[in-house]
Amino acid sequence: MNWRSERIWIELITGSRKTSNFCWACILFLGSLGFLLVGTSSYLGKNLISLLPSQQILFFPQGIVMSFYGIAGLFISSYLWCTISWNVGSGYDRFDRKEGIVCIFRWGFPGINRRIFLRFLMRDIQSIRMEVKEGLYSRRVLYMEIRGQGAIPLTRTDDNLTPREIEQKAAELAYFLRVPIELK
C-alpha cells in the first residue's frame, strides 16, 4: 500500500512476512522434524514413525547423519520463524517535498539497531539509479544516490519487478524528487 499527494510520497515496504517465507519455514520445520524422528527411532530401535521400520536404518552412520540434518534444519527453521515474527526488513520510505526531507525506516533484528532510521535532505539526492542485470539470475534494483553517502537501495532484490514496472517506478520517483535517472 502506497500513499501519494503533491508534496508527500509514502511507500510501505513488506518485510519477511511473505507467503514464500511462511511456506519455506513450514516445509523446513516438517522435513527436519521427520529427519530428527527417523534418526532418534534408529537410535532407540523403536518405530517412532510408522511408515519406516527402524530396523532398516542403522544408527551409525545413517541415523547420526539424519539426526544432524534434523537438528540443523530445526535451527534454520527457527531462524526463519523469528525473522517472520519480528518482520525484519519491513518499514517505509517517506519523501516529503514540503519539508525537503527523505526518511527511510526499516525494522531490523532485536538489539541496539532494531530500528533503522535514515534521514536525508532532498537537495543531497543526486539521482535515482536503476541497476538491471539480465540472464539466468536477473535482478532489477532501484537505488537512490546520496551525496557523500553512496547508494541506498529502495527496492528489494527479490521483488522481481518487470522492466516496465521498474522503469515506471524510477520515472515517477525521479519526477517527484526532481532528480535525473541513471542506468547501470
Swiss-Prot record:
It is found in: Plastid, Chloroplast thylakoid membrane. Keywords: Chloroplast, Membrane, Photosynthesis, Plastid, Thylakoid, Transmembrane, Transmembrane helix. The chain crosses the membrane at residues 22-42, 57-77. It holds the Pfam family Ycf4. It is a multi-pass membrane protein. It comes from the Eukaryota. Seems to be required for the assembly of the photosystem I complex. This is Photosystem I assembly protein Ycf4. It comes from Chloranthus spicatus (Chulantree).
